């Protein structure tokens, strides 16, 4: 695709690329249908990685509710409208974004590919798509930012240590983040049977904690821990325990030999598990963050209209309606079902982003029609990464943009700004 085609007619340009390659006998390595994409990704991942990435909480009914919510709404296409030129761009926090799509934060991407955080940064940046760097990345935010030519935000898990929170925000600002996305729904880890039945939590292996081990405040906390007398029983020596020790040791900054001698990697993992989340986080904590950054602050995980109103009262700049892809609370409402109530409560005063359950362009268009300013996507591009690395992630995003463009035009709508609730009906 040429740069002009990507932004003015991405659907037709993407189709042309695929069909022309097909005429020479080449087929897309990245499946364009959701079921085939999921199946190909599962084949490409280890059982542990697949369980962690694809799994959700409990019976996974919230994950299903996310999908069911989209299926309950149907587009109502209009005919004989000039849609020869389409505009997918949106305005967010003073920046014009070419597409209404945000790359949502996904942690522990090294389960899929060792360089996955860097790969998705490059893929998103090459398309001008805003990406959100995860607190649970496997590279420091500064390294990820250096790979990303596009706009980026930083996702904050609010630690039990305020000084660490402040350090993360300061680093995010310095590395060029344009917004802070506070994830609210992880005060405790959800009940995830796929991981529990395997006894597998990647953080214990030292995975996904590079933001922490690269942080001066966190490293001080680790040093303070190591200076205290050891407490508790020593881990039982088994082959699995040795593999865990090797895993955390090779991922920790420094040489393997020195890390093994010092015991710092284990102390870092234990410190992370202690400070990662704050179950006591409440509305009264938000001024602390507001006082420490001039960046827009978005709250991710809002589902109830009253929480949306309270967010406005707190001076929050944006809301992300999200169920964490169903990974935290089983039996909860689907994200799209929550969207209209939140949009109504907000009344256009701040942008509302829909995250969770998005499989393709038709889902993007339905969310936009129901009032979302933009749509966050996560698992789909992770699946692309698993299949074909950076190129796989890029192609998933290209396909999503292309389908969004085509569904928009075929529904008789020329611009995202024209989309409204009249474009859909509930069945």
Predicted regions and their residues:
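An N-cap/entry alpha-helix motif that binds or orients negatively charged groups
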Residues: 2-94, 199, 203-208, 215-281, ...
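C-terminal helical cap(s) of enzyme catalytic domains, especially alpha/beta-barrels
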Residues: 66, 197, 335-342, 385-405
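Short, conserved beta-strand segments within well-ordered enzyme catalytic domains
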Residues: 74, 89-91, 100-104, 130-132, ...
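Glycine-rich active-site/cofactor-binding loop and its immediate structural neighborhood
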Residues: 97-136
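A gly/proline- and charged-residue-enriched helix-loop-helix capping module
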Residues: 126-147, 151-165
């Amino acid at each position: 695709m040429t740069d002009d085609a990507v932004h003015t007619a991405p659907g037709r340009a993407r189709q042309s690329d695929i069909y022309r390659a097909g005429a020479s006998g080449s087929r897309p390595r990245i499946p364009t249908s959701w079921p085939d994409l999921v199946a190909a990704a599962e084949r490409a991942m280890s059982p542990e990685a697949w369980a962690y990435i694809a799994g959700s909480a409990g019976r996974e009914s919230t994950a299903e509710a996310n999908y069911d919510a989209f299926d309950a709404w149907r587009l109502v296409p209009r005919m004989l409208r000039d849609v020869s030129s389409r505009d997918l761009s949106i305005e967010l926090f003073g920046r014009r974004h070419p597409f209404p799509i945000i790359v949502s934060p996904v942690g522990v991407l090294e389960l899929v590919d060792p360089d996955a955080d860097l790969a998705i940064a490059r893929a998103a940046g090459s398309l001008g798509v805003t990406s959100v760097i995860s607190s649970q990345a496997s590279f420091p935010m500064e390294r990820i930012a250096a790979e990303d030519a596009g706009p980026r935000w930083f996702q904050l898990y609010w630690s039990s240590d305020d000084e660490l929170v402040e350090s993360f925000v300061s680093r995010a600002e310095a590395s060029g983040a344009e917004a802070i996305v506070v994830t609210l729904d992880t005060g405790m880890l959800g009940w995830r049977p796929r991981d529990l039945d395997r006894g597998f939590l990647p953080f214990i292996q030292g995975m996904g904690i590079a933001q922490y081990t690269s942080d001066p405040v966190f490293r001080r906390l680790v040093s303070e821990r190591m200076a205290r007398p050891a407490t508790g029983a020593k881990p039982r020596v088994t082959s699995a325990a040795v593999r865990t020790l090797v895993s955390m040791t090779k991922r920790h900054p420094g040489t393997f030999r020195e890390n093994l001698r010092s015991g710092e990697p284990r102390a870092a993992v234990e410190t992370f598990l202690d400070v990662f989340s704050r179950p006591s986080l409440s509305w009264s904590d938000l001024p602390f963050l507001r006082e420490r950054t001039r960046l827009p602050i978005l709250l991710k995980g809002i589902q109830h209209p009253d929480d949306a109103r309270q967010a406005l009262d707190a001076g929050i700049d944006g809301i992300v309606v999200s169920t964490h892809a169903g990974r935290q609370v089983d039996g909860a409402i689907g994200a799209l079902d929550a969207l209209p109530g939140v949009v109504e409560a907000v009344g256009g005063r701040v942008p509302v982003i829909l995250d969770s359950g998005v499989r393709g362009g038709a889902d993007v268009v339905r969310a936009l029609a129901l009032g979302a300013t933009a749509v966050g996507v996560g698992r789909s591009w992770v699946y692309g990464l698993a299949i074909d690395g950076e190129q796989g992630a890029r192609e998933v995003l290209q396909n999503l943009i292309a389908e969004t463009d085509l569904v928009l035009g075929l529904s008789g709508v020329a611009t995202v700004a024209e989309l409204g609730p009249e474009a859909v009906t509930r069945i």
